[in-house]
Amino acid sequence: PRARELGLKGLVASYQGSVITDIESGKLLVDGYLPADEAAEICKVFERLDLHTHVYTLNEFYVNRRDEALSLYEKICNVKGNVVEEEPLSGLVLRKALKIRKVLAMVYAEDKKRIFENVLKALGEKFYVTYSAANLVEVTSRAYSKGTAVKFMADYYGVPIERTIAAGDSLNDLPMLQAAGLGLAVKNADEALKDKAQSFPFTNDEDAIGKI
């Protein structure tokens, strides 16, 4: 809806590439949701680690605690979470048989590496585990990533993959940079991404995309 409000047309990818939507019609072209039992499995790991957790359906999200971090997230993203405190999110997901597109943990930046590694160890063989910011650890379907989204869009528009360009700033962008003909890590990118991708000498605040 927000892309439509801006007058944009074409396709938009979300939830780490597991959902691709036609902006004008709202039609889902790709919908790689997690079945309720798999989403609950992820939630139980997050619950064991006592993490601030969000679970996302297609158009809303549920969260296990109301705190300052959630208020800031809601303000920045202009969204409103459904706070669930009467039962674990794993129980809610199973009870409602929710189709979950993403499970996310909000963490302190200084704890991100440790928590990411713990989640990766527990879930990495079965699910796609990544992080998208200094304080966000995310888990989605292993079958999808921003890389699969780039390949889908290139095929959809009839553009050879070697003629595509992608730019990113965090680890969740790596599959996209690897899939594209030219993949660039902007100047302010996470060091883990810079180590694995070609660097570009401008930050996002310096209009890096416009200068490619």
Question: Language-model features: where?
Answer:
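Short, hinge-like loop/turn segments at secondary-structure boundaries
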Residues: 4-10, 29-32, 69-74, 146-148, ...
